[in-house]
Amino acid sequence: MFKKFLWRDCVFIIVLITTIALPAYIHTNYPQAFSRFFYPVEAWFTKRDLRCSKNAPHFLRQLLIEMIDEQKSLNNQVAFWHNGQLFHCESGWEDGFRGEKPMRVNSRFRYASVTKVLTSALVLHAINEQKLSLDSKIIELLELPAPKDPRVAAITIKMLLEHSAGFDRLKTYTPMLTMDVKPWCPTNLAQLSETKLDFDPETQFQYSNVGYCLLGAAIEKAYGRSFQSVAEDYFQLKKYGVSYVGDGFLPDEIQYDYRFEPFYAESYSKHFDFKDSLYAVGGLSGSAADIVQLLAALPKETPLTIFSHNHAPCSINILDACYGYALQPYQASRQSYTLWGKSGFFPGVNTDVFLDEQGNILATFRAASTKKTADTLLLRQYAYSLMNEYVNQK
């Protein structure tokens, strides 16, 4: 009996140690795996407290659920501008799961590449004011030396706007986002004359961060002052609560979720030059409600608007196949509704804005990296289907 008692006692101790020690070991050595395992539980709690403004369209709540379930983001904002009125919904917390600060309509996110919409709008405004033109050669405008690659001399403002200038970040690693390396744009612009392009300008579309940095430099040259100063005057950024990030995080910026981020963690922001190099590329911050209200208030200028585009043929029924001067048009097969969008990403945050030419504006902000990049395309298609249905039932 004593031996039997010892055997049972040993089994109990082993089970007890395993139950306590194994989770502690996993949590300490594999924190992402631990937090990923518990995500479904956290998602269930989060969905029990979705907060929406009065009379918010039902599809905003549907988007929040999609963002929680499929995009793996607990802490989210959705904002919608329709007929001169703002509607919004939020989920989660500013400071992490079950935190002390519920997500609010004015909680601050990084806009990431959604910033480029405003950079484009500022360039189009400068063209409308005849301070720039679509055909302005960037080498001549910036008064740079003759380039070693003669194709660089052909690059125009139009090519930079629509990502057809010859830069391919998949072939040549973007100088804007190399860890712990100061980008040559915009602080050493003469390096453009040393650059070899990845393809002949205007022969293909390839997304480019350096192209939008050069557009920021073009604005500074055209107006004779900093890009931030010109942007503040034109957009009235402070009025809308929109501000530039620096190196590190802003005091009122939300906490981001990196559990599904494959490489970067919270310290990533210290390794990139947000303050001096990324302001025109991905340097703005604010809420989803801030950006839709700012875009709704853009002056109605002519001849160019943020919906302007090159009329060269492209596959509008494929996401990311077409580029306008500010936004990317998408129209699903067998549909007549066109939605224009722009997406942004930094580690721990995904942002999207969607606009149509009827004046509807939607923004979806997620404070988390997605599990798979392809999931972000699914969200954009889902947003299109919901917007298409909502607009056409009115």
UniProtKB/Swiss-Prot annotation:
InterPro entries: Beta-lactam-related, Beta-lactam/transpept-like, Beta-lactam_class-A_AS, Diverse_Enzym_Activities. The keyword Phosphoprotein does not apply. Pfam families: Beta-lactamase (PF00144). This is Probable fimbrial assembly protein FimD, serogroup H1. PROSITE patterns: BETA_LACTAMASE_A. The keyword Transmembrane does not apply. Keywords: Fimbrium biogenesis.
